[in-house]
A protein has these predicted regions:
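Extracytoplasmic "Venus flytrap"/periplasmic binding protein-like
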Residues: 44-116, 123-125, 147-158, 258-259, ...
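Extracytoplasmic/periplasmic substrate-recognition and gating elements
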Residues: 47, 51-52, 152, 225, ...
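A structural signal for short loop-to-beta-strand junctions that line the ligand-binding cleft
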Residues: 81-82, 112-148, 176-180, 292-295, ...
Length: 412
């Protein structure tokens, strides 16, 4: 654990009154932003906050990821900081339900965040209250070989029929429509998320991952039926269960596959493998159900006011600072990700620009990712089931029955 503290002013404890004032000027922040880019971003944001608030002494406790996951419930209960980082959506739910996070609707109201952070408001809301401030996310969607589309006269598909037609054209040209590597399961979770969001919408998807809807529900079956259309048409890379997500990049680089449902972190290795920005493009996962608003997948990092922290007002002051457009621009420039504040700016990278435009205009909700939105046991069973379905779609009934047993056990 790394600790950063601002040196106390000389003679601060000289009087009881000054000591009381010093206590009022403290702020303790716990995070697991220990990778180089997030660590640098937090160093910068804390330095900026201190420069604007010289009367507040910031103590920053930095954990490694695994240590943080095992420690967070304990320190929120027994030795709470004022602020702690976590994730949006259902990942907040255990700490909200346990009374360990505090609602910050007032911070949003007083700082115009209902408008400037509107795209992420749904993922920050539980039981009608807002439980933190989001500061970074990155998009998922469809990354594709523009040159292969152009060579086969394929326009970017906007809806399900156009998407399937594009796949058929690619297959006829001897090109695998969609590459994927499901060896480590989570990539199949991303495909399920988008199919379910497009078929049934954000509210249904979140209720399903919370365990409130049966896996044998007809609406889940409708999602799986849409997936089966792609499987029956042979759209996915053969033997995908043997490949990692990185290994599945190779067919796309070699021109043997045209699309990948993936997060923006795939761009760097695709470029490093030799694809140019003239060859590589991005589009929003197409509409399936026109009655369903277009929700997106964008894992979101957040900061939360703790219920047991001692310096509530200073915590709220930091949250307001963190939400500012200029601050989110700076953080995400350092991290190479996207600001949530719609008044922030992004650099010249075309994929960041495309993601920022898409997410800033999203009104259907922001999902986090299957293994963030579902409890760990359900996420593991679900992603195992998705991979199995992609290999053996005829086992659908058994897979859904198995997932329903897991849901019932978790929620009994």
């Amino acid at each position: 654990m790394f600790q950063r503290t601002k040196t106390l002013l000389a003679g601060l404890a000289a009087s009881t009154m000054l000591t009381a004032a010093a206590f009022a000027g403290e702020l303790i922040i716990n995070t697991d932003t220990s990778d180089p880019a997030p660590k640098k971003a937090f160093e910068e944001v804390i330095a900026g906050f201190e420069a604007e608030n010289p009367d507040i002494k910031v103590t920053w406790n930095l954990f490694d990821h695994e240590g943080y996951k095992t420690s967070i419930r304990n320190f929120l209960t027994a030795d709470a900081p004022d602020l702690a980082n976590w994730y949006a959506g259902n990942r907040m739910l255990p700490y909200v339900n346990a009374g360990l996070f505090e609602a910050v609707d007032d911070v949003w109201e007083e700082n115009g965040l209902n408008e400037s952070l509107a795209s992420a408001k749904g993922s920050m809301t539980i039981d009608g209250k807002i439980w933190g401030v989001p500061y970074t996310y990155y998009q998922w969607g469809v990354y594709y070989r523009k040159d292969l589309f152009e060579a086969n006269n394929i326009a970017v598909p906007k809806n399900w029929d156009e998407f399937k037609a594009a796949g058929e054209t690619l297959k006829a040209a001897g090109i695998t429509p969609i590459t994927i590597g499901t060896k480590y399961l989570w990539t199949a979770g991303g495909v399920f998320d988008y199919l379910n969001l497009r078929t049934n919408g954000y509210e249904f998807h979140m209720a399903l991952t919370r365990g409130e809807i049966a896996w044998t529900d007809d609406r889940v079956r409708a999602t799986m039926a849409n997936w089966k259309e792609l499987l029956d048409a042979g759209f996915f890379l053969e033997n995908h269960a043997a490949f990692s997500w990185q290994e599945a990049l190779a067919p796309m680089v070699q021109g043997e596959a045209a699309m990948y449902v993936m997060g923006n972190f795939a761009v760097a290795p695709l470029r490093e493998a030799g694809l140019t920005d003239d060859q590589l493009g991005f589009f929003q996962f197409p509409m399936i159900n026109s009655d369903v608003p277009m929700a997106e997948e964008a894992p979101t990092d957040t900061i939360h006011l703790t219920a047991n922290g001692k310096n509530k007002e200073n915590g709220k002051k930091f949250l307001a600072y963190l939400a500012r457009a200029d601050v989110q621009t700076q953080i995400n420039e350092t991290m190479g990700q996207l600001p949530i504040n719609k008044n922030s700016s992004v650099g010249d990278d075309k994929f960041l620009q495309a993601g920022y435009e898409m997410l800033s205009n999203t009104d259907g909700g922001i999902a986090q990712f299957f293994d963030r939105d579902a409890p760990a046991e359900m996420a593991k069973a679900g992603m195992e089931g998705f991979q199995e379905f992609m290999v053996k779609p005829e086992r659908l009934d058994k897979i859904l029955e198995r997932l329903e047993k897991v849901r019932m056990r978790i929620n009994k």
